[in-house]
Amino acid sequence: MTPQVASDSAVPWPRRRTQAVNIGHVTVGGGHPVVVQSMTNTDTADVVASTKQVAELWRAGSEMVRLTVNNAQSAAAIPRIAERLAMMGIDVPLIGDFHYNGHQLLADEPACAEVLAKYRINPGNVGFGKKRDLQFGQLIECAIRYGKPIRIGANWGSLDQMLAAQLMDENNRRKQPWDAAQVLREVLICSAVGSAERAVELGLPRDRIVLSAKVSGVQELIAVYRDMAARCDFALHLGLTEAGIGSKGIVASSAALAVLLQEGIGDTIRISLTPEPGQSRTQEVIVAQELLQTTGHRAFTPMVTACPGCGRTTSEFFQELAKTVQQHVRDKMQVWKITHPGAETMTLAVMGCVVNGPGESRHANIGISLPGTGEMPVAPVFIDGEKSVTLRGENIAQDFIALVDDYVERRYARFPD
């Protein structure tokens, strides 16, 4: 299915020109829609648990899923995970996350090398000393042999120490030395871009390379990616590393990525949230989708506008209805994206009183203005800007959801009656 992009009027900024990289059946960069990816946190060697989590992430909307490949057992598990996913009818590109020993694992487990859609390589720990160039070359040779793209992902938590020492020495010789943060950014960028250019020299085509350079500070990340985007034409993967738990992680990631996306920088994103105990891993996928949709880059599910509530809305009914409607349309999109293409661009409004309720509802495709405190117990519904019907009684929620479903059927059905 072709990913839906918001209307041109919602995305006035130009996208950065990059190479287009094919990762399985997904294309990243080259003007294609920004892709959502995620990562498992299971022991990859546990085939059952890993398959289950990949499936959950895919059902939530992840378009690529990365798995840790850190030992022989996890490398051997990758083909079995892919086989189980295929039996479930799930076709999602699997990305192998390699550190330290990827060259050896891919050589020892050719089935793993063949099944993976992309290899993630960390230039900071691909090898040390004299082994660095050798082991990096072996990874690139494997990518060439199997026709796989790579992501060269630098991270300030695992910097290339030799490169860092070199750039520190050069900085000390400057007449006006840079501050430490600026040198750190330069190390990250040189590590990623320099490794990519070396991969090209070794024979890997430019359109099989994605870059990332992650830090955990919002302003540092923005500065790194602005600079890196200006220095190369490789597709870029965005992510704030170790963003944190709960609302802090969501806010930090959104603050950084929204700025870069607004400037046309970024071809694929991941929201690196620390899950709370017992929380589903799928939250990072939902947040990534909502970020892309609220910034006008993609459309995944109908968006529900709802007021925050005030003294006029002492009843919790409008809050409950907004939550119910949001969950209803998200659940329905599993089917609607096939049978009713375009439904994901629909806007809904669930408002709590007469002040902004009718006006906001008119702006939506379909909206409802519920009665506030002291108002008449009626709820006018507006469809495409016009008042359509007034709902009353105890079944307002069910009646409104029925109107939403009817609207989707009439407007977006692929095969209308």
Swiss-Prot record:
Keyword terms, alphabetized: 4Fe-4S, Iron, Iron-sulfur, Isoprene biosynthesis, Metal-binding, Oxidoreductase
Primary enzyme class: oxidoreductase
Cofactor(s) recorded in Swiss-Prot or TrEMBL: [4Fe-4S] cluster
Entry annotated with the keyword Secreted: no
Annotated SUPFAM superfamilies: Nitrite and sulphite reductase 4Fe-4S domain-like
Keyword Iron: yes
Reactions the enzyme catalyzes: (2E)-4-hydroxy-3-methylbut-2-enyl diphosphate + oxidized [flavodoxin] + H2O + 2 H(+) = 2-C-methyl-D-erythritol 2,4-cyclic diphosphate + reduced [flavodoxin]
Binding-site residues for [4Fe-4S] cluster, renumbered to this chain: 307, 310, 353, 360
Pathways involved: Isoprenoid biosynthesis; isopentenyl diphosphate biosynthesis via DXP pathway; isopentenyl diphosphate from 1-deoxy-D-xylulose 5-phosphate: step 5/6
Coiled-coil ranges from the UniProt annotation: none
EC number, as in UniProt: 1.17.7.3
GO biological process: isopentenyl diphosphate biosynthetic process, methylerythritol 4-phosphate pathway; terpenoid biosynthetic process
One Gene Ontology molecular-function label: iron ion binding
NCBIfam families attached to this UniProt entry: ispG_gcpE, PRK00366.1
Xref: PANTHER family: 4-HYDROXY-3-METHYLBUT-2-EN-1-YL DIPHOSPHATE SYNTHASE, 4-HYDROXY-3-METHYLBUT-2-EN-1-YL DIPHOSPHATE SYNTHASE (FERREDOXIN), CHLOROPLASTIC
Function description: Converts 2C-methyl-D-erythritol 2,4-cyclodiphosphate (ME-2,4cPP) into 1-hydroxy-2-methyl-2-(E)-butenyl 4-diphosphate.
Family as reported in the entry's similarity comment: Belongs to the IspG family.
Protein name: 4-hydroxy-3-methylbut-2-en-1-yl diphosphate synthase (flavodoxin)
Organism of origin: Xylella fastidiosa (strain 9a5c)
